[in-house]
UniProtKB/Swiss-Prot annotation:
Region (Domain III, AAA+ region): 105-322
Entry domain remark: Domain I is involved in oligomerization and binding regulators, domain II is flexibile and of varying length in different bacteria, domain III forms the AAA+ region, while domain IV binds dsDNA.
Species lineage: Bacteria, Pseudomonadati, Pseudomonadota, Gammaproteobacteria, Lysobacterales
SMART domains xref list: AAA, Bac_DnaA_C
GN (gene name): dnaA
Protein name: Chromosomal replication initiator protein DnaA
Coiled coil regions, renumbered to chain: none
Residue span of region Domain I, interacts with DnaA modulators: 1-68
């Protein structure tokens, strides 16, 4: 609807940029005729908008459209129904497919400068910078960033696109979610406008597509993307893609498309380690103009292990409650405020889950993983599971030992040290470790 962008423009002039970016930009509007629904990605944003911005939103919408009846909901704006087919006797001229325009579809907030580098993402950062500096180079075209949700893949993609535009303001950089590519193609088929659809991709300098796992099982979509990919690759136009796992692991993707995706550079983005998580919390706090003591950042980093999005959610909750109550942010305040969130996080990754995930990964029975047998095929996975339990949970060494058939805490400590040492020289073990971390963080 037209009124919401106008309303958002006014709100941007009235509220701090960090507040608008955090609470208002994620909203999607749906006009239901007699009312307007604003959809938010989660309940926390709904609560903040209701408490802090809803009265002003109602005033502005009433001013722009004469209707201030606004509802808030969690979810995504429903897709518009497909238009009824035109009468056969009066065929309409085909229209261009509704592709996202070149300008304005990249979020300028995401840059290389505000991306927090760590061991888990440094290769991805370096690859994205190279793609922005030397677009189309065969060494990183296509560039595929893969990993679980909320680890910074889209940030790197946006940063590369923004860097391309900064170096060449005339560059036509197109960003699409995979669902948008699919929807645009369907619309083009309905409108008999596939030629226009294909021409739009031939005119761009770089194509950025998020979450290509969505293409799985959609044969026609994969066919069109395959041809689009070939045209861009042959024209040395940069392609940057993201996926929630290594593409060869995605069932339903055609072999020829998997082969194309392997032509360039594929980089895993792993869950951040403790130091990187703490640095992210401190950096995000600075962006919001909030004062966060180091020990609070360390607390959040220690407890929230899965992804960057969860770290940001915890920080937003903390800062919002501090602003509402006027209290200082201390470790005690953080523990009180985030109690339920931290408990849920702890329960999500427990020792039984780690044991089952490791057993399944190595093709073992749980009874064998926990047995006293010391054959190499059992001992190494058992050590990996113990080390993961130490890395991902708050359990003590004796508690971990008890969970592994009553083993002594010194056995657990030896396993942790052994795995850390071996990973420095054993690439396969390091790969296993990172894959298990990703599985447990999903």
């Amino acid at each position: 609807m037209d009124a919401w962008p106008r309303c958002l423009e006014r709100l941007e002039a009235e509220f701090p940029p960090e507040d608008v970016h955090t609470w208002l930009k994620p909203l999607q509007a749906e006009d239901r005729g007699d009312s307007i629904v604003l959809y938010a990605p989660n309940a926390f944003i709904v609560d903040q908008v209701r408490e802090r911005y809803l009265p002003r939103i109602r005033e502005l919408l009433a001013y722009f459209v004469g209707n201030g009846d606004v509802a808030l909901a969690v979810g995504s704006r429903p897709r518009a129904p497909e238009p009824a087919p035109a009468p056969v006797a009066v065929p309409s001229a085909p229209q261009a497919a509704p592709i996202v325009p070149f300008a304005g579809n990249l979020d300028s907030h995401y840059t290389f400068a505000n991306f927090v580098e760590g061991r888990s993402n440094q290769l991805g950062l370096a690859a994205a910078i190279q793609a922005a500096q030397k677009p189309g180079d065969r060494a990183h075209n296509p560039l595929l960033l893969y990993g679980s949700t909320g680890l910074g893949k889209t940030h790197l993609m946006f940063a590369a696109g923004n860097a391309l535009r900064q170096a060449n303001p005339a560059a036509k950089v197109m960003y699409l979610r995979s669902e948008q590519f699919f929807s645009a193609m369907i619309r083009a088929l309905q409108d008999k406008a596939m030629d226009q659809f294909k021409r739009q991709f031939q005119q761009i300098d770089a194509l950025l597509i998020d979450d290509i796992q969505f293409f799985a099982g959609k044969d026609r979509t994969q066919e069109e993307f395959f041809h689009t990919f070939n045209a861009l690759f042959d024209g040395r136009q940069q392609i940057i893609l993201t996926c929630d796992r290594y593409p060869r692991e995605v069932e339903g993707l055609e072999p020829r498309l998997k082969s194309r995706l392997a032509w360039g550079l594929s980089v895993a983005i792993d869950p951040p380690d403790f130091e990187t998580r703490a640095a992210i919390v401190l950096a995000k706090a600075r962006e919001r103009g909030a004062e966060i003591p180091d020990d609070v950042a360390f607390l959040i980093a220690k407890k929230m292990r899965s992804n960057v999005r969860d770290l940001e959610g915890a920080l937003n909750t903390l800062v919002a409650r501090a602003n509402f109550t006027g209290r200082s942010i201390t470790v005690e305040f953080a523990q009180e405020t985030l109690r339920d969130l931290l408990r849920a996080q702890q329960q999500a990754i427990g020792i039984p889950n780690i044991q089952k995930t490791v057993a399944d990964y190595y093709g073992l029975q749980m009874k064998d993983l926990l047995s006293k047998r010391r054959t190499r095929s059992l001992a190494r996975p058992r050590q990996v599971a113990m080390a993961l339990a130490k890395e991902l949970t708050e359990h003590s060494l004796p508690e971990i030992g008890d969970a592994f058939a009553g083993r002594d805490h010194t056995t657990v400590l030896h396993a942790c040290r052994q795995i850390r040492t071996l990973m420095e020289a054993d690439g396969k073990l390091r790969e296993d470790w990172e894959k298990l971390i990703r599985k447990l963080s999903e």
